[in-house]
Amino acid sequence: MKASMFLALAGLVLLFVVGYASESEEKEFPIELLSKIFAVDVFKGEGRGCKGFGDSCTPGKNECCPNHACSNKHKWCKVYLGK
């Protein structure tokens, strides 16, 4: 009787420890994912020889990256959606 109670208690403790460890990993995963997503700035054209989203430009000079166009009104590169 004492052995079965000890085994049941040890099983519950083990279950608690495993559950806590997996929960802490689950909590860290979204944080790691978000940090990796926001560490990469895909909107900037640095190192590509073209200007990315939000960079200042001169209309008519074709300085913006592909799929971007220089706004005549605001004078910065924006995503070109076409018409």
From Swiss-Prot:
Please name the Pfam families in this protein's record: Toxin_12
The domain of life is Eukaryota
- Primary residence: secreted
Query: Which cysteines in this chain are paired by disulphide bridges?
Result: C50-C65, C57-C70, C64-C77
Signal peptide location: 1-21
Sites bearing Leucine amide, chain numbering? L81
Q: Does the keyword Cell division apply?
A: no
Q: Which PROSITE patterns match?
A: HWTX_1
Query: Record's family?
Result: Belongs to the neurotoxin 10 (Hwtx-1) family. 15 (Hntx-3) subfamily.
> What name is this protein filed under?
Mu-theraphotoxin-Hhn2j 4
Q: Which organism is it from?
A: Cyriopagopus hainanus
